[in-house]
Amino acid sequence: MSWRLVYASTVGTSHISADLPCQDACQMQIAWLNDQQPLLSVFVADGAGSVSQGGEGAMLAVNEAMAYMSQKVQGGELGLNDVLATNMVLTIRQRLFAEAEAKELAVRDFACTFLGLISSPDGTLIMQIGDGGVVVDLGHGLQLPLTPMAGEYANMTHFITDEDAVSRLETFTSTGRAHKVAAFTDGIQRLALNMLDNSPHVPFFTPFFNGLAAATQEQLDLLPELLKQFLSSPAVNERTDDDKTLALALWAE
């Protein structure tokens, strides 16, 4: 019994034509709790395209989130609840404010969305500021517990650097381990979700989870590159010109 993971980020065609790098970031990790049970952590961020350091902000956000989780696991204090989510967001904001001050920039120059999922045998926590989504199967099929956040105007959303970020933070908690996890930035939101009701578009996810379930160890090593090729494919780029990130995890019995 173990987690099977794969994730990839690819630059959008609009960023390529503007000679911009990918401004998405992702981190996934398995940590081992004191009872030798595995803890899955997944963090995804999308740097705002309208600011100068959005990609840097996204990378700092996911790295700081993972460092925060490592510290919590080492300390043996791990309640998967709103308090953990809020403290993580505050820690990320502190890091972004420090970086902005060091570079003599405004913190809004590091604006990014932030999504996270943490899952142990005892519970699952999802957190979100901004658009993108975390789809999860908790034993009753795929669901999207938190709706992607839209801003006041079209193509706008909320960012972890916003003054009201902590109050905007949305969380979802459930008892028990997640069976399947898919976290993604808004670049593939229209492929991954039925936009009319913000429900998971199951046919989009099924091949990925089937592939994770059937893969040999050698094939698992190849999956990140295959996922990257898919995200950069003409079929995907016809639907979106944005950066794209997809992180997948499957609990294999």
Swiss-Prot record:
InterPro entries for this protein: PPM-type-like_dom_sf
Recorded GO MF terms: phosphatase activity; protein serine/threonine phosphatase activity
EC number: 3.1.3.16
Stored Gene3D superfamilies: PPM-type phosphatase domain
UniProt PTM: Phosphorylated by YegI.
Phenotype when changing D46N: Loss of phosphatase activity
Keyword Transmembrane carried by entry: no
Keywords: Hydrolase, Manganese, Phosphoprotein, Protein phosphatase
Regulation: Activity dramatically decreases in the presence of the general protein phosphatase inhibitor sodium phosphate. Slightly inhibited by sodium fluoride. Activity decreases in the presence of the metal chelator EDTA.
Record field: catalytic activity: O-phospho-L-seryl-[protein] + H2O = L-seryl-[protein] + phosphate; O-phospho-L-threonyl-[protein] + H2O = L-threonyl-[protein] + phosphate
Cofactor(s) it depends on: Mn(2+)
Pfam families: PP2C_2
Keyword Disulfide bond: no
Function: PP2C-like phosphatase that can dephosphorylate YegI. In vitro, can hydrolyze p-nitrophenyl phosphate (pNPP) to p-nitrophenol.
Protein name: Serine/threonine-protein phosphatase 3
Species this chain originates from: Escherichia coli (strain K12)
